[in-house]
């Protein structure tokens, strides 16, 4: 396994560990999720470019679109929770009953 793949995989693992450790604040969780999506995007792009997958050229762009949608929804939820309760604790998400 080349060094580039190992570094990207380690970036994914560090982001995953950050998500598991810093799960009390919503902003920390969102930043760790963005790190995971960024490492997945780079891994998918490097894989497509190295293996010359012509049918999978759009896959990194589609993943980037999903990451942008996830970020927009996460930030809107962060704004709603912080305006309602004054903090960005993940525990406050249990109080949001529709």
From Swiss-Prot:
UniProt enzyme class: translocase
MF terms (GO), sorted A to Z: NADH dehydrogenase (ubiquinone) activity
TM helices/strands, residue ranges: 1-21, 29-49, 61-81
A single GO cellular-component term on record: respiratory chain complex I
Record key words, sorted: Electron transport, Membrane, Mitochondrion, Mitochondrion inner membrane, NAD, Respiratory chain, Translocase, Transmembrane, Transmembrane helix, Transport, Ubiquinone
Topology of the protein relative to the lipid bilayer: Multi-pass membrane protein
Keyword Mitochondrion in annotation: yes
Keyword Transport: yes
Compartments in which it is found: Mitochondrion inner membrane
The reaction(s) this protein catalyses: a ubiquinone + NADH + 5 H(+)(in) = a ubiquinol + NAD(+) + 4 H(+)(out)
Record text on subunit structure and interactions: Core subunit of respiratory chain NADH dehydrogenase (Complex I) which is composed of 45 different subunits.
Family (UniProt): Belongs to the complex I subunit 4L family.
Protein name stated in the entry: NADH-ubiquinone oxidoreductase chain 4L
Name of the encoding gene: MT-ND4L
